[in-house]
């Protein structure tokens, strides 16, 4: 299991507010919690940056982290990420912030310590481009956006 460096920026993290952790042995994402001074109400259409109380340094250029919404918050309450998916590069060392967007019709209260997102570590492959005049023919060619059919 790779080791990722973490700096605790909020003394409540690891005490009153749990550290990021996997909820089950099969979980792909670490739960991230709102390290707020007080609960806040996210109005419909409003987006706010929510601190997590920690910074990470992945260090390994073959890894990155993605921040994803929690499915229940999105489905039941319309709370998703304002940037849809957050990307944390291996050389980033600042606080992990979660952009929360209320796309639902009702105000939503985010409590101190509430689970607001999940972080998944993924492998990274950097590529170089080879410029060509034409591509070798493929069955799909330029078809996209539903081109392969509905069923």
UniProtKB/Swiss-Prot annotation:
Q: Which residues form a coiled coil?
A: none
Listed under catalytic activity are:
dUTP + H2O = dUMP + diphosphate + H(+)
Listed EC numbers: 3.6.1.23
UniProt-listed InterPro entries: dUTPase, dUTPase-like, dUTPase-like_sf, dUTPase_trimeric
Q: Which UniProt keywords apply?
A: Hydrolase, Magnesium, Metal-binding, Nucleotide metabolism
The pathway where this protein functions is: Pyrimidine metabolism; dUMP biosynthesis; dUMP from dCTP (dUTP route): step 2/2
Q: List the protein's name.
A: Deoxyuridine 5'-triphosphate nucleotidohydrolase
- Organism field: Methylococcus capsulatus (strain ATCC 33009 / NCIMB 11132 / Bath)
């Amino acid at each position: 299991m790779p080791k990722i460096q973490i700096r605790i920026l909020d003394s409540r993290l690891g005490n009153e507010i749990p550290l990021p952790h996997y909820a089950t042995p099969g979980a792909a994402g670490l739960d991230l919690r709102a390290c707020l001074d007080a609960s806040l109400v996210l109005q419909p259409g409003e987006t706010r940056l929510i601190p997590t109380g920690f910074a990470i340094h992945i260090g390994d250029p073959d890894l990155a982290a993605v921040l994803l919404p929690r499915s229940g918050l999105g489905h039941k309450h319309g709370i998703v990420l304002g940037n849809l998916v957050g990307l944390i590069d291996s050389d980033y060392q600042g606080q992990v912030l979660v952009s929360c967007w209320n796309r639902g019709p009702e105000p939503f209260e985010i409590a101190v310590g509430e689970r607001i997102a999940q972080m998944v570590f993924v492998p990274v492959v950097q590529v170089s481009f080879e410029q060509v005049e034409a591509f070798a023919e493929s069955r799909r060619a330029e078809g996209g956006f539903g081109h392969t059919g509905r069923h």
